[in-house]
A protein has these predicted regions:
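Thiol/disulfide oxidoreductase modules built on the thioredoxin-like
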Residues: 150-159, 164-216
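Extracytoplasmic/luminal low-complexity segments enriched in Pro/Gly and acidic/polar residues
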Residues: 213-225
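A short beta-strand-turn-helix
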Residues: 70-75, 80-102
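Active-site acidic short loop of glycosyltransferases
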Residues: 98-99, 130, 157-159
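Structural microenvironment flanking redox-active thiols in thiol-disulfide oxidoreductases
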Residues: 115-155, 164-173, 209, 224-225
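Conserved redox-active cysteine motifs that mediate thiol-disulfide chemistry
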Residues: 98, 106-123
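Alpha/beta-hydrolase fold active-site loops
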Residues: 101-102, 133, 181, 191
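N-terminal targeting signals for export/organelle localization
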Residues: 1-78, 224-225
Length: 225
């Protein structure tokens, strides 16, 4: 019996089948290993998951007003949509801010929650704005630049970059034309970190902590006084 089995297993066709099966298993192993390495490579799935030893997307930071902040766990890039292209402005794209983290806030003059949170965004820019981070206010408002600037002046908001999206081109591109205010944070590579729909206190320690985690660990001790 054993002799017959050995004879069958040593036939050329059977040998080819055996070695073919071994080769297929080896190929599956190589492909699986490559997939795991690719998934674990920094930046392979959109925004970096960690700055230093701390994760950028940290559920522990979602407290207070920031409990409404939603991390972007699927890759989303800052759209290259042109905006600020009204008669008085120069065309701008979010990609123009590449190299620094940005907080983009969509607001309008008719939006009461927007008006309430704008001073806190001004305070955030004054505290953290610089080479690594910038607050960008985008007025998604058909009333136009004059009305938007008058409202900012009335509220005493002057520190952030103020731009227009009168035709809602950018707001639509980020999926936020339906409701305001909407705030979206992008890292220095143009990857969306997350967004918050509705009013928030962006001068709070909780907001500062989220922004600092995106900027880098060297800034994490910086809190509002």
């Amino acid at each position: 019996m054993n002799g017959s089995l050995i004879h069958i297993l040593t036939r050329p066709r059977m040998m080819l089948m055996i070695w073919g099966g071994i080769g297929a298993l080896f190929l599956i192993y190589v492909m699986a290993s490559a997939a795991v390495q690719s998934a674990n490579r920094p930046g392979a799935n959109g925004p970096a998951y960690a700055v230093g030893a701390k994760p950028v997307r940290d559920p522990k930071l979602l407290i207070g007003d920031m409990a409404k902040f939603s991390y972007a766990f699927s890759p989303r890039r800052a759209p290259a949509t042109q905006f600020n292209d009204d008669a008085e402005g120069s065309p701008v794209r979010l990609t123009d801010f590449s190299g620094k983290a940005i907080l983009v806030n969509f607001w309008a003059t008719w939006c009461a929650p927007c008006r309430k949170e704008l001073p806190s965004l001004d305070a955030l820019q004054q505290r953290l704005g610089g080479e690594q981070f910038e607050v960008v206010l985008v007025a998604a408002d058909p009333k136009g630049r004059t009305a938007a600037q008058a409202m900012l002046t009335k509220l005493g908001v002057s520190a952030p970059t103020a731009l227009m999206d009168e035709k809602l081109a950018l707001a639509s591109a980020v999926g936020g034309a339906a409701a305001l205010p909407l705030t979206v944070i992008y890292d220095a590579s143009g990857n969306e970190v997350g967004r918050l729909l509705g009013e928030a206190d962006w001068a709070s320690d909780e907001a500062i902590a989220i922004v600092n985690r995106v900027i880098g660990p060297e800034n994490e001790s910086v809190l509002m006084p």
